[in-house]
Regions:
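Acidic pyrophosphate-coordinating catalytic loop
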Residues: 12-17, 33, 73-75, 120-132
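Acidic, metal-coordinating catalytic segment for phosphate/diphosphate chemistry
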Residues: 14-59, 73
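Conserved hydrophobic/aromatic beta-strand scaffold that supports enzyme active sites
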Residues: 21-23, 64, 133-135, 158-160
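Conserved Nudix-box catalytic region and its N-terminal flanking loop in Nudix hydrolases
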Residues: 41-44, 61-101, 143, 147-152, ...
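A mid-sequence, solvent-exposed acidic-amphipathic segment
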Residues: 104, 110-122, 127
């Protein structure tokens, strides 16, 4: 809305390690009119990301990956998670270029046509990261194995699943990361249309 405005008072880096935390001081308009007091918030900053649900329309199969996740471990959840291939968009790189790089690194696959699904904020109350989600056409007959970059300590299992089986994982809450859930739910809504397009 045009009357919703924010004013940055100051910004500093509060922590810099594997990731970065910024401290933002700002004011913003209020729904009942006027401006808020000056507010200070720490924001987790890790750059912008992209992810791709790899799909073989002929076989009606998706390719998912499974790896250990420190965030899930710290939250007391099962730390090996089913996910779609994803990564951080590097400087001077588009989301599409990153997706093509990551599918090779994480799954040993080359992805064909990409269909944009959604560009979402993951946790806008505390993190600046957004994720551009795509559907990517692949040949699932060539998928499977363990991949990842040793220098990044990646140990990534690549698994081919019939779409119905993958979606059942969502319904049983066995896929509990938002990007994977969004991608699979989108495909559930648009699968017939995608299979016609990619005949």
């Amino acid at each position: 809305m045009s009357d919703e405005k924010a004013e940055l008072v100051s910004h500093e880096v509060a922590f810099k390690g594997y990731f970065q935390v910024g401290r933002y001081v700002f004011r913003h308009t209020l729904h009942k009119g006027g401006m808020s007091d000056v507010v200070s918030r720490e924001v987790f900053e890790r750059g912008q990301a992209g992810g791709v649900l790899m799909y073989d329309p002929g076989r009606d199969e998706v390719v998912l990956i499974r790896q250990f996740r420190a965030g899930a471990y710290a939250a007391g959840r099962h730390p090996w998670t089913w996910e779609i291939v994803a990564g951080i968009i590097e400087e001077k790189e588009t989301a599409e270029i990153m997706i093509r790089r990551e599918t090779v690194e994480e799954a040993g696959l080359s992805v064909g046509e990409l269909i944009p699904i959604q560009n979402v904020m993951l946790t806008p109350g505390a993190c600046s990261e957004s994720c551009q989600i795509f559907l990517g056409r692949i040949d699932s007959s060539k998928a499977g194995g363990v991949f990842g970059l040793a220098e990044e300590h990646e140990d990534i299992l690549v698994k081919v699943l019939p779409f119905a089986e993958a979606y059942a994982l969502v319904e049983r809450n066995e896929i509990d990361n938002a990007v994977g859930v969004i991608a699979l739910q989108w495909l559930a809504l648009h699968r017939d249309e995608v299979r016609k397009r990619w005949r």
